[in-house]
From Swiss-Prot:
Residues 697-733 form the SAP domain. Keywords: ATP-binding, DNA damage, DNA recombination, DNA repair, DNA-binding, Helicase, Hydrolase, Nucleotide-binding, Nucleus. One of its GO terms (biological process) is positive regulation of DNA-templated transcription. It holds the Pfam family Ku_C. This is ATP-dependent DNA helicase ku70. Transmembrane segments: none annotated. GO terms for molecular function: ATP binding; ATP hydrolysis activity; damaged DNA binding; DNA helicase activity; double-stranded DNA binding; telomeric DNA binding. Involved in non-homologous end joining (NHEJ) DNA double strand break repair. GO terms for cellular component: chromatin; Ku70:Ku80 complex; nucleus. SUPFAM superfamilies: SPOC domain-like (SSF100939), vWA-like (SSF53300). It comes from Dictyostelium discoideum.
Length: 909
């Protein structure tokens, strides 16, 4: 079984199957864990090899890893009558909210299977909640998302009327504070089954309420209920429960007004959420609402909290003088990009289909007693004696440097080149909660680095067990923009995108009337959107700033000295074609026409999407898998638009017939060059001592060097590299052990064509020591009046074979002697799919058979093989267009030899 150590948490955790792994630990009576030399190297590996593990250490024990927190989200959806009225886009707001809920549940199942999601409707006709409030229906408590919820929500969308689901809309107006109270109760009743920490599990969660509504002023005429709702929102904020508003417009003329009620309900825990530009935007389309939800769906979690040491470089933190002489700034490390992987499988019990819980027990090999973690020690044998280590000592040995960033100095920003980044960068942000004053000190450092144009060079150790890396900290200034300017820019961007779409549609349309209509529509849309732009007086009243880019530092991982390679300069001859400026301008025009607006969010991994679509179809018990769109494929429409321009450029660069002349000349040159190399290299006639002295031996291939050593009765190691083989040859010649009289046994790279005799051994000197293998053959006994001997078939040219042998047709090659002398007997040889003649020898046939033995026999055994042939393959023809007639290895496809010399001399199918 395969899986991970993180199991699904569900309600039936008590009935989960327990998978127990028993480790038998051998050793003396004190029960230590003994390592070999290989295992000793493994103990220095970190606890987590993914690079995102626990960042705690001795010097920073107070830091916690936020990745251990779970995300708990309650979808609080308004079910009033106004939510079921179609908007200007003919979309129902309630349906848009439910669709967003389905998408979020699907994403959570794929990416975060331990997060909790709850669903609550308010302003309903029925009630279902713990507090027994009217007009509140809890569809699902906070729990791990289940595919059954998706089926229930999809059934709700299929029904045109909400009342068919048994809920309906309430007649009057319910107190909004009761909905907030219900959410608070749902958070307090989170099931503890999936928690490993027990009582504190409810505190280590991100708690959020996603509120979907188009009513901007609930309980407008009841100040008491409004005050209760505001107080309830403050109580939720004190419990670290955050409310995220997803507002929707009722119509074009009835926009959602945030200032009427919800500006008192939303309490921002930090400045980051307050500066979010999507917090106050109302959506009318499902795509806009989904995009807004995507930004809020996943909580921004840091990889960990790390200190930035400035000052004394001494790692001894116990020295009070060293602590006083340095400044420590608390920072949080974030991943800006990460590679998307398929989720790991989870072990399940085949009987109950519940997650398997893994338990590991360490058992002493001598006493068979279960060992506690405190009874297990580590050791390494040195001088015949075990050297014992405790866990604390092992942690000290594995800790090379203190955790965090240690400032070494500064370098100009222009010295940090783009190719210095060897992996995706990370981002650090100050954290004032761990060490007060970190934000002030960090901002001062960033400001001075920006003024001086410097980058900080630091030694970075993410974990106590990891090796330190050299990194460069690149400062980034904060960018703020007023809300009015941001909204204007968004409208102008949407206007420009619509203009581009209309221009492209105009180019594709053929009639002039359609173009004029589209131009009129374009002018009307421009006038409408210009009217939607706020006036100067409205802009002056709205001075709220929106953060476009935060202040911080990018962590650039620097390479080591041997990681940088400089390519050799390649000399370019200037006697080629002269390119005119006109053709250069054409090439520039092609590049401009092929440019697209790149948005990384539009390009997803098609393999992952297909994988998740298959899982979703299985979980929801659907017959068909939803088709996924592959946006990585080339844009065929864009390519078709530039075909004429590309052809014009090609005609201007290449003369008529240039491409065909080059291709034919190249093929003829390459074939002639290959023939010269193949026929000209004769290892038996080479002056090996002179080649070693002049250094020309380095031009030979590894197979040539091995052939020479094998000729001199020297067997090199199978892992020997080319330099090792050259050293062996140099030592052989300089030591006087060179035997030139054996060079005549060396063969050329292209061996001569085989004779009539078929050799059954593989040309291996150790063939007698190999286990013999019987080859099955289909034999037919025929009577021969005269001598019958096996001979190789005549060579047939490739061109003739293409004409005479159509695909998928059997034919036989008859022996000259047997066709002339034998009576009714014929020797048939098969030509397989690659035009190789396959001889399957019977067990009694061997190379030692001579003509006298054959003449004395009245009957002879001939092998008949009948298979179909396919079209000849180009790579199987050698030597002036002749098909392959190399000798067949007696082991055929089951041959165990891997040396290249044997593979070149014999065929195996």
């Amino acid at each position: 079984m395969s899986g991970t150590n993180s199991w699904l948490n569900n309600n039936n955790n008590n009935s989960n199957t327990t998978l127990t792994n028993t480790n038998t630990i051998g050793g003396t009576n004190f029960g230590i864990n003994q390592f070999d030399g290989d295992d000793w190297d493994n103990i220095f590996d970190g606890n987590n090899g993914d690079g995102d593990g626990d960042l705690d250490g001795d010097s920073y024990k107070s830091y916690q890893n936020p990745y251990s927190y779970r995300d708990c989200i309650i979808f609080l959806i308004d079910a009033s009558k106004a939510m079921f009225e179609p908007n200007e886009n003919n979309e129902i707001p309630f349906h848009n909210a439910v669709k967003c809920l389905i998408q979020t549940i699907t994403d959570k199942i794929i990416t975060s299977d331990s997060d909790l999601i709850g669903v609550c409707f308010y302003n309903t006709n029925k009630k279902k909640n713990i507090n027994d409030f009217e007009n509140i229906y809890v569809l699902s408590d906070l729990d791990i998302p289940d595919p059954k919820i998706i089926l229930t929500l999809e059934e709700m969308l299929e029904n045109s009327n909400f009342t068919t689901n048994g809920l309906g809309n309430c007649q009057g107006e319910m107190p909004f504070c009761d909905a907030l109270w219900t959410c608070s109760t749902m958070f307090s009743n989170i099931k503890q089954s999936g928690s490993s920490s027990g009582e504190n599990s409810n505190n280590n969660n991100f708690k959020r309420i996603f509120l979907f509504t188009n009513e901007d002023n609930p309980n407008a005429y009841n100040d008491s209920i409004r005050n209760s709702s505001i107080q309830r929102s403050k109580d939720l904020s004190d419990l670290n429960i955050q409310i995220e508003l997803f507002s929707m417009n009722k119509s074009v003329n009835d926009k959602f007004d945030f200032s009427l009620f919800y500006q008192h309900i939303l309490i921002f825990a930090d400045e980051e959420n307050y500066l979010d530009p999507t917090q106050f935007d109302a959506s009318s389309k499902f795509s806009d609402l989904r995009f807004k939800l995507k930004r809020k769906e996943f909580k921004k979690r840091s990889l960990g909290k790390l200190p930035l040491y400035i000052g004394n470089l001494n790692n001894n933190n116990n020295n009070s003088n060293s602590l006083d002489s340095q400044v420590i700034i608390s920072t949080q490390l974030y991943n800006l990009f990460s590679h998307a992987h398929k989720s790991s499988p989870t072990l399940l019990d085949p009987k109950t289909n519940l997650p398997v819980k893994q338990l590991i027990k360490n058992v002493c090999a001598n006493t068979q007693a279960t060992l506690l973690p405190s009874q297990i020690k580590l050791c390494y044998h040195y001088g015949g004696e075990p050297v014992i280590f405790t866990k604390d000592e092992m942690q000290t040995i594995k800790s090379i440097d203190r955790i965090g960033f240690t400032l070494l100095g500064f370098k100009p920003l222009e010295n940090i080149k783009p190719y210095h980044s060897i992996k995706h960068s990370q981002f650090i942000f100050p954290d004032d909660q761990s060490i007060k004053g970190s934000v002030l000190a960090f901002n001062a450092l960033v400001e001075q680095m920006l003024k001086s144009g410097k980058a900080a060079i630091c030694r970075f150790t993410p974990r106590s067990s990891s090796s330190p890396r050299m990194v460069a900290l690149i400062p980034q200034e904060e960018i703020l923009q007023s809300e009015s300017e941001f909204n204007n820019q968004q409208l102008l961007n949407s206007l420009s995108s619509q203009q581009q779409q209309q221009q492209s549609s105009q180019q594709s349309s053929s009639s002039q009337q359609q173009q004029q209509q589209q131009q009129q529509q374009q002018q009307q849309q421009q006038q409408q959107q210009q009217q939607q732009l706020p006036s100067s007086s409205q802009q002056s009243n709205n001075n709220r700033k929106i953060q476009i880019r935060p202040r911080g530092m990018h962590v650039i991982y620097l390479p080591f000295a041997d990681d940088i390679r400089y390519p050799n300069n390649i000399g370019v001859k200037s006697d080629g074609l002269e390119i005119k400026q006109e053709n250069i301008d054409k090439a520039k025009n092609i590049i401009k026409m092929m440019k697209i607006k790149f948005d990384e969010k539009k390009f997803v991994n098609p393999g992952l999407q297909k994988h998740y679509a298959s899982l979703q179809a299985i979980a929801l018990e659907r017959d068909k898998v939803e088709e996924t769109v592959d946006n990585i494929q080339p844009d065929r429409k864009l390519i078709e638009k530039v075909i004429d321009t590309t052809q014009d450029f090609s005609d201007g660069i290449f003369p008529v017939g240039y491409a065909s002349t080059v291709s034919s000349a190249t093929s003829s040159t390459s074939s002639s060059s290959a023939k010269r190399l193949r026929d000209g290299k004769d290892l038996s006639t080479m002056d090996w001592p002179d080649m070693v002295k002049s250094g020309e031996i380095i031009k030979l291939t590894v197979d040539d060097l091995k052939s020479f050593l094998s000729n001199q009765n020297i067997k090199p190691s199978s892992k020997a590299k080319k330099a090792d083989l050259i050293d062996l040859i140099s030592n052989l010649i300089s030591g006087g052990n060179f035997k030139p009289d054996k060079l005549h046994l060396l063969k050329k790279d292209s061996p001569p064509l085989s004779d009539n005799t078929i050799t059954t051994n593989g040309g291996d000197d150790d063939d007698n020591n190999r286990p013999s293998k019987k080859v099955k053959s289909t034999s037919t006994s025929t009577t021969a009046s005269k001598n019958t001997s096996s001979s190789s078939p005549p060579l047939v040219s490739a061109a003739t074979m293409n004409k005479k042998a159509p695909p998928k047709k059997s034919f036989s090659v008859k022996d000259k002697n047997s066709s002339n002398n034998s009576s009714g007997g014929s020797s048939k040889a098969n030509v397989n799919d690659e035009f190789d003649i396959d001889f399957k020898n019977s067990d009694q046939d061997d190379d030692t058979d001579n003509e006298s033995d054959v003449n004395n026999k009245a009957t002879t055994s001939t092998t008949t093989i009948t298979t179909t042939t396919a079209a000849p393959k180009k790579n199987n023809f050698v030597n002036n267009g002749m098909f392959d007639t190399r000798e067949l290895c007696k082991y055929g496809k089951n041959c165990y030899r891997t040396n290249k010399q044997h593979l070149d001399e014999y065929r195996h199918q």
